């Protein structure tokens, strides 16, 4: 696939499903059913190695298994992306080679946590980390991070540009900017400048679902986020509408989804990145797309009150929950 992997459209970061609240065993059939739903919606790729997929909480054997299942379900229709989540460079390289050999078509690359100590002065650390991975693994990857992120994902536009130029197989960037459209513009500008210098295409993706219309109108290429596990059809519809120039339709869909978007982003009860992935799973569970919403520890479930808020928000957004709100038990694992 190499440099021909064009990063655009809707790329869901797919959650895993467990057989019960112990979270000790993957529910492979339920996972396949979720993938089949997503593949019916004209998505552009399946990202199975991201944080929304709890990659950092899975064994390597489990990570390879979800890649294999995704490849079986995708049947070549869309690429399957594994994930690189490692603090040591040698570990990142090893993860890449193992997943590559298992069939991953590309990767979502998460920065090491050491970058969080000082993103301004740690630029060379990140670039060396990524470049060594790039040269050893020789596979396309999408980088993750942005200027308004927290912790290790805070990456400045000048670093985005430099990495995009120096890492040959970097083909896309998942930009995290919260609600800051100006920050997205800065990243987009930096990456487009890198495109001109290198002659390669770099897909610029919004990390969230709250300003999807705005970021695509600005020149972005789509979205990569865990929210698409419950709203992939709507996200694809928004993307296509903007690309066709039907901005009225795109905003109508985005505005209709505002209640559940706000509920998941914690607008009603306190913004918190920590619970985004659990809320994505709860939304998918309420809508019947997965049979259970459990996540492995240290993640704790959202409260019953939050589940009630989310169910109400789904209804207000024109969606049809098939389950009642209830308390979610804490995982055993």
Where in this protein do the model-derived segments appear?
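Active-site beta->alpha loop and helix N-cap motifs at the rims of alpha/beta catalytic domains
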Residues: 2-154, 299-300
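A general structural signal for well-ordered alpha-helical segments in protein cores
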Residues: 31, 67, 92, 184, ...
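Structured C-terminal cap/extension of enzyme domains
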Residues: 40, 213-333
């Amino acid at each position: 696939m190499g440099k021909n992997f064009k990063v655009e459209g809707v790329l869901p970061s797919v959650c895993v499903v467990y057989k019960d609240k112990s979270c000790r065993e993957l529910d492979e059939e339920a996972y396949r059913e979720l993938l089949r739903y997503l593949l019916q919606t004209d998505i552009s790729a399946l990202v199975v190695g991201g944080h929304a997929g709890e990659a950092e909480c899975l064994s390597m054997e489990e990570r390879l298994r979800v890649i294999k299942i995704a490849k079986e379900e995708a049947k070549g229709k869309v690429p399957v992306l594994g994930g690189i989540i490692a603090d040591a460079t040698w570990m990142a390289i090893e993860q890449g080679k193992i997943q590559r050999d298992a069939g991953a078509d590309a990767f979502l690359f998460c920065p090491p946590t050491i970058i969080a100590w000082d993103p301004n002065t740690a630029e060379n650390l990140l670039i060396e980390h990524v470049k060594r991975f790039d040269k050893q693994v020789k596979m396309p990857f999408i980088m993750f991070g942005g200027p308004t992120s927290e912790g290790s994902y805070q990456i400045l536009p000048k670093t985005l540009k430099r990495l995009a130029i120096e890492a040959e197989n970097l083909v896309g960037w998942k930009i995290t900017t919260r609600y800051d459209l100006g920050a997205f513009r800065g990243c987009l500008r930096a990456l487009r400048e890198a495109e001109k210098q290198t002659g390669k295409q770099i897909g610029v993706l919004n990390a969230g679902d709250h300003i999807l219309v705005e970021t695509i109108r600005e020149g972005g290429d789509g979205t990569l986020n865990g929210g698409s596990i419950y709203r992939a059809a709507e996200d694809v519809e928004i993307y296509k509408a903007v690309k066709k120039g039907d901005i009225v339709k795109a905003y109508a869909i985005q505005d209709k989804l505002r209640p559940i978007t706000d509920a998941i982003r914690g607008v009603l009860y306190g913004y918190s990145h920590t619970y985004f992935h659990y809320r994505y799973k709860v939304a998918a569970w309420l809508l019947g797309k997965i049979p259970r919403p459990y996540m492995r520890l240290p993640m704790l479930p959202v409260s019953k009150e939050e589940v009630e808020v989310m169910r109400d928000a789904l209804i207000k957004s024109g969606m049809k929950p098939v389950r009642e709100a209830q308390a979610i038990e804490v995982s055993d694992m």
